[in-house]
Amino acid sequence: MSEGEVQVIELINNFFLKSALLLEQSKVAHNFDTEEALRDGNHLFNIETRGDPLLEAQIQPWITFDGVKTMPPLVIETYLDLRALQPNHMVYLHDADGNPWMVCKGGKKTEIVLERWLVELDKQTIDDSIDSNDPENLHKQLVLLFRYLYTLTQLLPANDIITKPHNSQQPALINVQTRLLDGSKPILSKGRVGLSKPIIASYSNTMNETNIASHLEQRKITPIKTTFGSLRITVSYRKDVDFYVIDSDDLQKRYMTPSLSNETTTVPDRRASSNCSRSMSVSPKTNTINATLFPLEGSSARRQSISSKLQPFKVGSVGSGSFVQSGSAQSTTSLVPSLSRNVSSSSVVAALKVQRGSAGSTIVNGDVPPELSSVGSGSKYSSSFGRIRRHSSIRRSESFDRTAKPRKSTENPPEDLLEFVKLLEDKKELNMKPNTILPQQDISNSLMRFQSMKSNNDALSDNLSMSMSIDQPNVRFGSNSHSPIPSFSPNYGSIPSRLSQGSRNNSNAELITSRKSSLDRHKHNLLSRTGSNVDINRRGSVGTMETTNEDSKEDEQSHMKGMHFSNEATINKDDDEDEMLMKRSFNAGTSTTEQVMGSPRSIRSISVSSYPRNQLPLKHLNLSHPTTSATTTHAKFHKSEMSPDPLHTEGAQPHTSSQHHNSSQKNDEDDDLLFVMSDMNLTN
């Protein structure tokens, strides 16, 4: 055997020894003797390790390689020692999401395997090259391999258990240990949790691409080839190693069977904090009254203190609180029904005041926030509780101030609640443009519609200015009748009131007189334009009609009689003559003769009796000056039968004196314009 081969065999033996020492000392903290001199092999491969006689004795089968015999694989296990646990201990494991998983109870399992290292010389892959037989080249490769190995040991999850600090006063219940095993023999997992057993249920029966269980991971170091085989190092380890131990006896003492003092101090405090958090969820300005509890003597006193606590206020409340009152059982039980319902802060203060005066008990260490004096102005958010705040008058009592001194609340609201309150306080402008602004097209259409109505309004104003009276009657209507407003609809009438019958009868005569005077002025203006020589004397025309037209006189008399007895007025015959006069004046300017035919009874057919007084379309307004308004007007003109005018007809034959007298009477009758106001409908 050559010298180079001897050096290569020595490097292979040191490879196994250095690997075992490095893995053991990286996982287990030993108390080495500092006075012990370092041997030559401690600095081998530029990695410093301490000598371990026990480990060196166990590793003898792997450091006696002679180049001929077959070396078994070296298995180094890193495990969690559970032998120090008692039956009352329970081992749990946290997964990646922080969920606890129970592993075992104390005494059931002795070990939990965390890592398994495999160090071997694989003779199936032999390299006969010159570089593989060079000891210096092999040494350089082994230096790089151990540097990577040391780095890998510091990065594996099991290193977190080793570096985790623990209480030095109490011995650790679980420790990390290592063990050397012969890889050629089967490895048994009886009495321990093997590496192949998943603890977390989600990993069970799941394999990854490399045919490895999902709760495990594997790392391989690049092998180094020699003339005797390849040096390999492989590791398989658990991904989740966050193990911890719980003592069941401590849990029962702490949570299941607490002492009297602990129950009276811790449990009510937790309830008070929960009530405070619930009450603040109502609104940012919710009033909360907290009371610090003192230890009570006797179990009965403890039960009374728990039963006297108020439940959180429900819908419709403005605050909630937690009250505890020390004293006799009678005072405690009497406070419960008075404060058990949902009441406002004012009723709470009043109930406490009454209770203090009756039973003489006081509230200990009560925290009264300043919002109690102004609950109505405290909240600036609109809610359904505003009505309750407005109707509740809250006043602070001097006796209550003396017994309960205000203090700052020791319970701070959670951060998420504070952020929610800040979000509510941020004022943001509401975007109301899509709902309030109308389209431009609608605005333009409205403007065009109003412009088109202007011409109609002007024409209507001219017509109304001629039809309405210029001079109002001297006597104004001053009756303040409480009867229903007269209806101006021609289809539906209203029942006239008896209280205003007298005033209506007087107003009918005044209405006819005012209409006559207004028609005189219109008649004068129209005849002046046509050049007619017709006499427009109002009284003369009326007198002519009274002497020549007997029918008209009878109508006048019947009309006046109906004014006094039936409250149904008829139109004056003079209005008929006014219409004929107006029509005659318009026909005078034409060159052709127009034969106007009409019913002989057309004038008589128009009677006010068909229109009750309360349905007259003319509204009487007590105005000092004429008023023009844009209203819809409907008018009917009735024409009487008349013969051609001899003064304006060419080629007319002379008539007898009687005929000429009759025609002159007809001409006088035609001088007046009959403008029947009863058929005009003025609708506002």
From Swiss-Prot:
Quaternary structure (record): Interacts with ATG1 to form the ATG1-ATG13 kinase complex.
Superkingdom in the source lineage: Eukaryota
InterPro entries linked: ATG13, Atg13_N, HORMA_dom_sf
Record key words, sorted: Autophagy, Cytoplasm, Protein transport, Transport
Similarity annotation: Belongs to the ATG13 family. Fungi subfamily.
Described function: Activates the ATG1 kinase in a nutritional condition dependent manner through the TOR pathway, leading to autophagy. Also involved in cytoplasm to vacuole transport (Cvt) and more specifically in Cvt vesicle formation. Seems to play a role in the switching machinery regulating the conversion between the Cvt pathway and autophagy. Finally, ATG13 is also required for glycogen storage during stationary phase.
UniProt-recorded name of the protein: Autophagy-related protein 13
Compositional bias (Low complexity): 624-634
Gene3D superfamilies, A to Z: 6.10.140.1900, HORMA domain
GO CC annotation: Atg1/ULK1 kinase complex; cytosol; phagophore assembly site
Record organism: Kluyveromyces lactis (strain ATCC 8585 / CBS 2359 / DSM 70799 / NBRC 1267 / NRRL Y-1140 / WM37) (Yeast)
Stretch list, region Disordered: 260-284, 394-414, 491-520, 532-559, 623-684
One Gene Ontology term from the biological process aspect of the record: piecemeal microautophagy of the nucleus
Comp. bias intervals (Polar residues): 491-516, 654-665
Biased composition (Basic and acidic residues): 395-410
Compartments in which it is found: Cytoplasm; Preautophagosomal structure
